[in-house]
């Protein structure tokens, strides 16, 4: 319970990465962050510093989530970078890229176990994104790069349901 309270605190308040320590998370913690039945809509994006499509879509995600902040939309970027990248290389990359949002590093190595926790069809490829609106029951998983236009369309759908 204490762990969940800490996790919710991390997710609830946008942590500015410029001086942030990036928390380690288990996939169960990630799932719990959006399974709490709250009236907040969560966008969880799985990415890595070495994944060009991942890095390319993140600025648009950040801008769109800011646009819908009043509707309680929150973004969590979950890095799937290798352990050698944690935390220094990830933090430096995030700072250089101006990714001012919630960031965590997935402290898991077995994709056969953690991928189905998000979606049974997830092969482990990135970028991958799940959008969950606890208030409406909307839940949709994407295993591909999304344009800003596609992403905003999905955010609008999730808010309207």
Regions found by a protein language model. Give the residues of each.
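Loop/turn elements at helix/coil->beta-strand transitions in domains of secreted/extracellular proteins
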Residues: 37-42, 71-74, 99-102
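Bacterial Sec-dependent N-terminal signal peptides
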Residues: 1-27, 160
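Thiol-/selenol-based redox modules, centered on thioredoxin-like
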Residues: 126-161
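A short beta-strand-turn-helix
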Residues: 21-42, 65
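Short, internal strand/loop/helix patches
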Residues: 93-126
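Structural microenvironment flanking redox-active thiols in thiol-disulfide oxidoreductases
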Residues: 59-97, 111-115
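Conserved redox-active cysteine motifs that mediate thiol-disulfide chemistry
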Residues: 46-60
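Short pre-active-site segment immediately N-terminal to redox-active cysteine/selenocysteine motifs
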Residues: 40-42, 47-50, 125
């Amino acid at each position: 319970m204490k762990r969940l309270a800490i996790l919710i605190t991390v997710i609830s308040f946008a942590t500015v990465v410029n001086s942030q320590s990036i928390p380690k998370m288990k996939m169960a913690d990630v799932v719990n962050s959006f399974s709490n039945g709250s009236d907040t809509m969560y966008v969880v994006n799985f990415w890595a510093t070495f994944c060009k499509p991942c890095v390319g879509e993140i600025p648009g995600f950040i801008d769109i989530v800011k646009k819908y902040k009043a509707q309680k939309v929150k973004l969590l970027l979950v890095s799937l970078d290798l352990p050698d990248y944690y935390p220094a290389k990830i933090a430096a990359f995030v700072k250089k890229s101006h990714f001012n949002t919630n960031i965590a590093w997935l402290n898991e190595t077995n994709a056969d176990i953690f991928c189905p926790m998000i979606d049974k069809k997830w092969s482990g490829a990135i970028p991958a994104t799940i959008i969950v609106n606890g208030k409406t029951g909307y839940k949709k998983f994407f295993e591909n790069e999304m344009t800003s236009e596609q992403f905003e369309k999905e955010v609008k759908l999730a808010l309207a349901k």
